[in-house]
Amino acid sequence: MNILLKDFKYPESWNKSPNQSNQYIDQVFEDTNKIGIYELNNQDHYLYVENLLNVTSYLYPTFDKEQLRLCATYLHWLFLIDDFLEDEYNTMSEKQNDVIKSHAQILLTGQYLNSDVDVKPSEKLTMFLQNTSKDWAIKYNKFDVHNIYMTTLFQWLYSVYPLNKTTESTKPIHMDLYTFIRKVNIGVAGSIIVGLLADKDITDIDISKIWLNPIFTRIMENSTIQIGLVNDCASYDKEYANGGHITNPLYFLQVRDNLTFNETLNFIVNKCNQSIDEIIKDEQLLLKQLKDQGYTENQLNQVNIILNYNHNLIQGNINWSLISKRYNNHDGKPFIFENTKSKYI
């Protein structure tokens, strides 16, 4: 049994075509070439960046070229730092802590932890991200959003190793613990807040107040659950082939809870659809609460812009997962999906 794309429920209004602009790929490649990450004339390096960053068009379908560049800078950093931490320091606890501290220092202060030694390319990448965000905040007067953005990335840094360390246990990870870690580790909060930093339309509400609203927090958490599980489905075949499937729920639910593969698939689909239902309910609760607090119709419309950005992430993620070489197996197609239309609510 395969999961069909139509098994995942979405409101029809969430479905958007990818952004047609892709200049941001060349721009980010050139930016990071200056840092020393890539070789400018190396086609393999360029294809690697292209395969990573085409997700930007799916997650941010309504943004202009300048906004796409800002968001792509974040996504590129997220993917590279995640791979760097997992590949280079997966079993070296003391060095793990040192690496995390060095990147955290850059995010929080805009300064290197130890400038007396040679600065690593990965640290230069984090500094470039920090400076890019700060420059945007100055240009558009968004320092509150910039601060939330840096705090969110700081929290994400400390989520990478806890997930990896769950593989050290002789027992499979429990779904509740996995979900708790993935709420931060999947990077959805960063994807939302960088979109809000990039936004040029929200002018009449305080974004930070919406971000701190507990109902909006629950909306984001349900989004992370859904997006994380979709990515797990899309990447399972490749992870299994590479031996990286231990923390994938398609594997550990079978082992821990003695489920068949089909039962595991059904559980994941139901969990995803339940998350979507909860998001829709909470959106109405949030809008009603804000209206009762005196938000005008125009202000509520701007809150809806924020909610729509989240819809774009959810819907764009599953569409990108179908074609992503980051998740797909060797034949270019994730075994878990068939390319059919979404089932709308």
From Swiss-Prot:
InterPro entries: Isoprenoid_synthase_dom_sf, Terpene_cyclase-like_2. It is an enzyme of class 4 (lyase). The keyword Lyase applies. GO terms for biological process: sesquiterpene biosynthetic process. GO terms for molecular function: alpha-farnesene synthase activity; metal ion binding; terpene synthase activity. Keywords: Lyase, Metal-binding. A motif (DDxx(x)D/E motif) lies at residues 82-87. Signal peptide: none annotated. Induction: Expression is detectable but at low levels in vegetatively growing cells and increases during development induced by starvation. Expression is highest during the ultimate stage of mature fruiting body (approximately 24 hours after induction). The keyword Lyase applies. Belongs to the terpene synthase family. Contains several highly conserved motifs that are important for catalytic activity including the aspartate-rich 'DDxx(x)D/E' motif and the 'NDxxSxxxD/E' motif, both of which are involved in complexing metal ions to coordinate the binding of the isoprenyl diphosphate substrate in the active site. PANTHER family: TERPENE SYNTHASE, TERPENE SYNTHASE 1-RELATED. This is Terpene synthase 1. The gene is TPS1.
